[in-house]
A protein has these predicted regions:
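Juxta-kinase regulatory segment immediately upstream of eukaryotic protein kinase catalytic domains
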Residues: 1-13
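A glycine-centered beta->alpha junction motif in the catalytic cores
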Residues: 50-59, 104-119, 165-175, 239, ...
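An alpha-helical support segment within catalytic cores of ATP-dependent transferases
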Residues: 142-153, 158, 163-203, 268-270
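ATP/Mg2+ or Mg2+-diphosphate-binding catalytic cores
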Residues: 289-345
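ATP-binding glycine-rich phosphate-binding loop
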Residues: 15-35
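Active-site activation/catalytic loop segments of kinase-like enzymes and analogous catalytic loops
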Residues: 165-174, 232-267, 281-298, 310-318
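Active-site acidic catalytic loop and adjacent metal/ATP-binding pocket
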Residues: 26-33, 46-47, 137, 189-236, ...
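ATP-binding pocket architecture of kinase catalytic cores
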Residues: 33-35, 39-156, 161-162
Length: 345
């Protein structure tokens, strides 16, 4: 790591290292404090350490990169594409030759959630800016033939079904009625077909209030390495429903923000609301399954502590969707809902 920093700033001294909170991935983050060096040497930089070249779980499931995996880090590949279309990404200062580490611009410690919930903050304005940025990014991020990995994978019927199965396998009590589970699978298969028929655009995939930072009055976007093609409202649903976000984004504010996005993106508001509900329901079911998987299989109990917020969101969207009575009932009677712990938030 020291050699990686010195390659970028030969005259700088490493004055200190401190851990930075990460997320569900195999990546770890450190903040390096730097002294001296050339005029372009920042006071701090972020060091990302990777256990492997890692791609998203479903990317592996779809085998889009073949048995040997991607040729380069997806983070670097997607960054190269996006950085020509927005200045919201952190700069990549250096990447290790073996792809086990990279040095990034430090975009601070203020996720969008903290900015929106700070005393005196205007949540509608904060989240609205994030939606404006998203709409602009979607409008500019067309495939240019440069080899961006996002255009090699998409939320198609197969992937939607895979994520629904992930929910059934890990999010529901295995002792639930076999008949109810069979009907749930049939309902979600039909929903996967509806979702797969929607037009697809460039999608961050985890565009939520902890992957957006407010840094020196600018919104900065991180964790974009799992980008793919998906319905346009998927990232909107991610932003407005992830984790504890519905504590802040009530139905009235949600409706206002969806209208703002629709106007900025140039899509009919009624179509945006319908697609939003479908995407939000699919995504929150995936999250219920994923958080249980992370807690039970990967040994990360903090994710189980978020489920008491996530499960009510799943029930709310189940009530908005036609044709899912068995799924709706299982969300009431057989879902694994975790236990609350404020420290996990």
């Amino acid at each position: 790591m020291r050699s990686l920093l010195s390659q970028r700033w030969p005259d700088a001294q490493l004055a200190g290292l401190e851990g930075v909170r990460g997320d569900a991935s195999s990546r770890r983050y450190l903040r390096a404090r730097l002294d001296g060096g050339a005029s372009d040497c920042p006071e701090t930089a972020i060091v990302m350490l990777m256990e492997d070249a890692g791609v998203a779980l479903s990317s592996d499931e779809l085998s889009v990169f073949g048995d040997d995996g991607p040729r380069e880090l997806p983070f670097v590949n997607v960054w190269r594409f996006l950085s020509t279309r927005t200045d919201a990404l952190p700069e990549i200062y250096r990447v290790a030759d073996d792809s086990t580490a990279m040095v990034l611009e430090d975009v601070g410690d203020t996720p969008l959630w903290d900015a929106a919930t700070a005393p005196g903050a205007d949540p509608e304005a904060v989240f609205g800016r994030a939606l404006d940025l998203l709409a602009d990014l979607q409008a500019s991020a067309a495939d240019d033939g440069s080899g961006c990995y996002a255009f090699k994978q998409s939320f198609d019927e197969r992937l939607f079904r895979w994520e629904f199965e992930h929910f059934i396998e890990y999010g529901l009590d295995p002792e639930a009625s076999a008949g109810a589970l069979t009907e749930c699978r049939a309902e979600l298969a039909r929903l996967a077909d509806r979702l797969a028929a929607l037009p697809r655009v460039f999608c961050h995939r985890d565009y939520h209030a902890w992957n957006l930072h407010l840094h020196r009055s600018r919104i900065r976007v991180i964790d974009f390495q799992d980008a793919l093609l998906a319905p346009a409202l998927y990232d909107v649903a991610s932003l407005l429903t992830d984790r504890i976000t519905p504590r802040l984004i009530d139905p009235s504010l949600e409706a206002s923000l969806i209208t703002r996005y629709a106007q900025h993106a140039g899509v009919p508001a009624d179509r945006a609301r319908e697609e939003y509900n479908l995407c939000a329901f699919q995504r929150v079911l995936k999250v219920v399954g994923r958080f249980n998987f992370l807690a039970e299989v990967k040994g990360k109990p903090a994710y189980a502590a978020m489920l008491p917020d996530v499960v009510p969101t799943a029930r709310e969207f189940a009530a908005r969707i036609d044709g899912v009575p068995a799924t709706r009932e299982l969300l009431q009677s057989a879902v694994k809902a975790g236990q609350a712990r404020e420290a996990a938030l």
